[in-house]
Amino acid sequence: MLMRFGPMPPVMHVHTANYRLVVLRGEMKHWAQGQTAADVDVLGPGSFWYQPGGQPHADVCLSDQCEMFISWDGKRDAHAAP
């Protein structure tokens, strides 16, 4: 699926399914629970990450708009992290 969003406050959340994401446009940061945005590198076009289901994480778009391709192993959902 293609997803686009602009800058917004990051929220720690979880998904049921694993996913793989490729940044197509813009610059982002992605981090796991226990880290902060300051702990991780900026991810630009071509950057990739694998996110295990059930693992709390957050991400933020640092550009006017970010576009990503996401491949899910199952149902697409999102819930606030415990």
Per-region residue spans from a language model:
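Solvent-exposed coil/turn segments that connect beta secondary-structure elements
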Residues: M8, E27, G54, D73-K75
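A short local loop/turn or secondary-structure capping micro-motif enriched for an aromatic residue
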Residues: P9-P10, R20, A38-D39, D59, ...
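Double-stranded beta-helix
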Residues: A58-P82
